């Protein structure tokens, strides 16, 4: 491979919550037992150095010693348009349809604020990304879950009958959709998205689609943007993206929305701008331009190969050494969602004991119950 995905780099003291946040009173219960180092496998943050074009773009901009007010560059918009066309087959995207968001979750709330009233019911699938749960609850929205169900092959699927039932019974007119799905790792097939959009159109449900993981698709799978499903989907959907998951840029801050519906776009732009908080950082702008290049695309292709190999190894190891721990190999993202129900029953253990055993030897992982997995670890 051309890029380095094997070096172990010490991130301690370098602004990495993945390791520095694991202290008593922080994000970890206590340090591991003597002789064990921390292996950060909790927050969605990779331990790979980012693509060189990003650091080069930032370094070049820093050489100019002025960081005053600025306008978003055409290079920024053109980089997004080209990236979406190259990676996702998107056509007809113009700069007018792109809007800056400090973060995907902030974009979710801005969109909900113009689509709903406080206290409205909003449809989400469960298991559920913990960020959705916190943001929607904190902002006064009521979450109605439609559980994903496993098919005969153990693959998580949408339960369309349950979705329709929940939509009708709860008078729902907005959904927050995750594609690819976190934490289950599903990369939805076209027929699944088409069927979901048919339901949303039938019952006048607006769609807020978090596609932040759309670049991290494991080999053998393909991401399909929700807005590409139909003209109605294009007009009904607020799509949210960011280079942060793909290139390890969460600390730089910077996401964006794509909204083709002008009336909806104008309202979301207005909502996002009300506090003047939702403002771009100049270095973040240059980082995106550095990321969304041909070299960035080549780097992502090698990243996908690396993650695919790591996932294959991890799932094979778990199946061989921990019978009873069920894990569906993710099709996208780099998260594993471990169902420990059978293993715990067979060994007389609780999920708390299993999690603690991991922390004792330095495996920093997350309680799956926060993601609506009753006996799970993410």
Located regions from the model:
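N-terminal small-domain helix-loop-helix segment of the aminotransferase-like
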Residues: 2-103, 110, 293-294
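Conserved core segment of the aminotransferase class I/II
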Residues: 56, 230-308, 315-316, 320
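Conserved core of the PLP fold type I
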Residues: 67-198, 215-216, 221-229
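Hydrophobic residues in well-ordered beta-strands that form the structural core
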Residues: 124, 145, 209, 365-367
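A short helix->loop->beta-strand "cap" motif at the edges of active sites that frequently abuts
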Residues: 141, 202-205, 234-235
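Conserved glycine-rich beta-strand-loop-beta hairpin in the small C-terminal domain of fold type I
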Residues: 289, 305-315, 327-341, 375
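Conserved C-terminal alpha-helix-loop-beta "cap" of PLP-dependent enzymes
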Residues: 324-326, 338-378
């Amino acid at each position: 491979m051309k890029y380095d995905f094997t070096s172990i780099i010490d991130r301690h003291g370098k602004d990495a919550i993945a390791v520095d946040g694991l202290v008593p009173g922080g994000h970890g219960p206590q340090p591991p037992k003597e002789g064990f180092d921390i292996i950060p496998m909790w927050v969605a943050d990779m331990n790979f150095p980012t693509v060189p074009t990003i650091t080069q773009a930032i370094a070049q901009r820093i050489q100019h010693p002025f960081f005053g007010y600025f306008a978003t560059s055409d290079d920024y918009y053109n980089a997004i348009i080209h990236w979406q066309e190259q990676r996702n087959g998107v056509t007809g995207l113009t700069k007018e349809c792109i809007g800056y968001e400090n973060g995907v979750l902030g974009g979710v709330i801005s969109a909900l604020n113009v689509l709903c009233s406080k206290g409205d019911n909003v449809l989400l699938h469960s298991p559920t990304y913990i960020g959705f749960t916190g943001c929607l609850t904190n902002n006064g929205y009521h979450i109605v879950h439609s559980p994903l169900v496993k098919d005969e092959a153990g693959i998580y699927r949408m339960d369309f009958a349950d979705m329709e039932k929940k939509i009708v019974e709860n008078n729902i007119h907005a959904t927050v959709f995750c594609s690819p799905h976190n934490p289950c790792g599903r990369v939805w097939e076209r027929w699944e998205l088409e069927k979901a959009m048919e339901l949303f159109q039938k019952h006048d449900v607006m769609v807020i689609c978090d596609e932040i993981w759309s670049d991290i698709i494991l080999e053998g799978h393909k991401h399909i943007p929700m807005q590409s499903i139909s003209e109605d989907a294009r007009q009904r959907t607020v799509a949210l993206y960011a280079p942060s998951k793909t290139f390890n840029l969460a600390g730089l801050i910077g996401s964006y929305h794509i909204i083709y519906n002008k009336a909806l776009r104008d309202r979301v732009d207005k909502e996002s701008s009300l506090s003047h908080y939702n403002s771009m950082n100049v270095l973040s702008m240059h980082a995106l331009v550095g990321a969304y290049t041909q070299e960035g695309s080549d780097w992502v292709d090698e990243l996908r190969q690396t993650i695919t190999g790591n996932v294959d190894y991890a799932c094979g190891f778990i199946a061989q050494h921990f019978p009873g721990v069920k894990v569906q190999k993710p099709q996208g993202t780099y998260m594993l969602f471990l169902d420990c129900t059978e293993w715990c029953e067979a060994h007389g253990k609780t999920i708390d004991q299993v999690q603690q055993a991991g922390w004792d030897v330095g495996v920093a992982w997350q309680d799956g119950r926060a993601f609506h997995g009753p006996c799970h670890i993410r």
